[in-house]
Amino acid sequence: MRLMVHLEAQRDATYQTAYHHKLRGRVWRALEGSKFDSEHDNGHPLGLAFSNIFPWGKIQEGDRRSLLFASPREDLLATIARGLQRNRDFNVGEMSFEVDDLSQLTVDVGEPGTRGVIETATGVVVRLTPEHREQYGIEAEHDAPTYWRPEHTIKPFKDAIRANLQHKHDRFAHEYQDGPTDVDGELFEGYDLLKTYALPVTVTTGTTLDVVLSKWRFDYRVRNDAHRHHLNLALDAGIGGRNGLGFGFSNIVEKTKPGESELERADAFA
């Protein structure tokens, strides 16, 4: 499930690319006094992913911008919505907005047999654990965290995002449902790396880390209902780590239903 937040700029501003920590703070202010307050910094995924404020670019007073929240927990999104309705000021650092409207969206990869492409809208964080490093012979970089890079090959990346998604499955799915590491088959059919880049990120007040991020296009074909659940969970809870800072948010950019050709999907003969 997704929540679209429609914003109106209150004054001119430069778009801040280092928005993550400030935006997370605004989310938690919307959750103040709710049952989710106790989950702040408890070490477990909240089950929330969110986009950047879009479109990018210099902000002028009166501009319309948007922001998307996604979560497998409908009550979490409902609580955020109520918090934003109570206090419509939406300030992220020097960027000052007011919440103009809220709308609900449903995103689904489709029934079994559906093919499509999921593209990451924000960078994916994959921090390799000591077990991953040992398994794949990756040397640690002094005391700094080891983030996935292309030279590590694709296998550690696949294993890491799958294990991360399993952790989210264990927290948010029904016990009777198999998780992504409980079944055979890849999460995605294709992994097209678009770019990698480093970004200084404030993870807590006074603590900034240089994080290595990657952006992707993932090809998928829905094998069965369990696989459909796993893909939708990735869309709702985010891919990889640091989702609470807005990383790993993704969108479906192509989708072809079973029995439908690419030409039909694109209305090529219209």
Curated annotation (Swiss-Prot):
<comment type="similarity">
    <text>Belongs to the CRISPR-associated protein Cas6/Cse3/CasE family.</text>
</comment>
<keyword id="KW-0051">Antiviral defense</keyword>
<protein>
    <recommendedName>
        <fullName>CRISPR-associated endoribonuclease Cas6</fullName>
        <ecNumber>3.1.-.-</ecNumber>
    </recommendedName>
</protein>
<dbReference type="InterPro" id="IPR049435">
    <property type="entry name" value="Cas_Cas6_C"/>
</dbReference>
<comment type="function">
    <text>CRISPR (clustered regularly interspaced short palindromic repeat) is an adaptive immune system that provides protection against mobile genetic elements (viruses, transposable elements and conjugative plasmids). CRISPR clusters contain sequences complementary to antecedent mobile elements and target invading nucleic acids. CRISPR clusters are transcribed and processed into CRISPR RNA (crRNA). This protein probably processes pre-crRNA into individual crRNA units, and also plays a role in generation or stability of the CRISPR leader-repeat transcript.</text>
</comment>
<keyword id="KW-0255">Endonuclease</keyword>
<keyword id="KW-0614">Plasmid</keyword>
<dbReference type="Pfam" id="PF01881">
    <property type="entry name" value="Cas_Cas6_C"/>
</dbReference>
<keyword id="KW-0694">RNA-binding</keyword>
<dbReference type="InterPro" id="IPR045747">
    <property type="entry name" value="CRISPR-assoc_prot_Cas6_N_sf"/>
</dbReference>
<feature type="active site" description="Proton donor">
    <location>
        <position position="41"/>
    </location>
</feature>
<keyword id="KW-0378">Hydrolase</keyword>
<keyword id="KW-0540">Nuclease</keyword>
<dbReference type="GO" id="GO:0004519">
    <property type="term" value="F:endonuclease activity"/>
</dbReference>
<dbReference type="GO" id="GO:0051607">
    <property type="term" value="P:defense response to virus"/>
</dbReference>
<dbReference type="GO" id="GO:0003723">
    <property type="term" value="F:RNA binding"/>
</dbReference>
<dbReference type="InterPro" id="IPR010156">
    <property type="entry name" value="CRISPR-assoc_prot_Cas6"/>
</dbReference>
